[in-house]
Amino acid sequence: MSAISRSALAVDFVGGAVGYKLRSGAARSHALLKATGVSANRPLHVIDATAGLGRDSFLLASMGATVTLIERSPQVHALLAQGLEAARAESDEIAAIVARMTLIHGDARALLPTLQADVVTVDPMHPARTKTALVKQEMRLLREMVGADPDVADLMQAALVARCGRVVLKWPLRAEPLAGIRKPSYQIAGKTVRYDVFVNPRAPAEEALPRADDLALFRF
């Protein structure tokens, strides 16, 4: 990726669409909240297994959730760290949200067996659309930086056996179901994506494994 492209990709939790949703209260009706079960009265612990630009994690944290962000790309991890640091210095309100976000650099497939949470979310690089003009420039830049996610089925398998109450897969609205995994318990549709929700019948054993938010070493 060129230096120009790299500089065009940034993590911003204050301005743009993220800031607007926070200021306007529009985030409260987001389909992701319904899929995860997160609300102001139910501040769950969520592991975002594919943090990306961190927007979904910030949305969940803004509603009171404690969120652990796992990102395996060194470049994207660095962008997230910069974005979190900048957001923390913006205002007391934003700093309080960021304080509920813990960033870890690593492969979620290896980390998930060592952690527990109420919810695990997975938002892989979605299959490329045939009409590339429909793909936002930002997502094209991100795809150039990290490439595709050919191992998404393996990641989902790791998530489905993790110590959590449910797994939420973010997937294109009209795309075929992800092959190689079991059928979701139910689906929640958004405007352009859907959330495939996999409910685990057993709650995680609280004493068996550390909760990811206890890993203060990785907190930003």
From Swiss-Prot:
Q: Which reaction does it catalyse?
A: guanosine(1516) in 16S rRNA + S-adenosyl-L-methionine = N(2)-methylguanosine(1516) in 16S rRNA + S-adenosyl-L-homocysteine + H(+)
| Main location per the UniProt record | cytoplasm
**Which chain positions lie within coiled-coil regions?**
none
Quote one Gene Ontology molecular function term. Answer: rRNA (guanine-N2-)-methyltransferase activity
Disulfide bridge map? none
Q: EC number(s) of the enzyme?
A: 2.1.1.242
Q: Which key words tag this protein in UniProt?
A: Cytoplasm, Methyltransferase, rRNA processing, S-adenosyl-L-methionine, Transferase
Family the UniProt entry places it in: Belongs to the methyltransferase superfamily. RsmJ family.
Designated name of the protein: Ribosomal RNA small subunit methyltransferase J
Q: Which organism is it from?
A: Rhodopseudomonas palustris (strain BisB5)
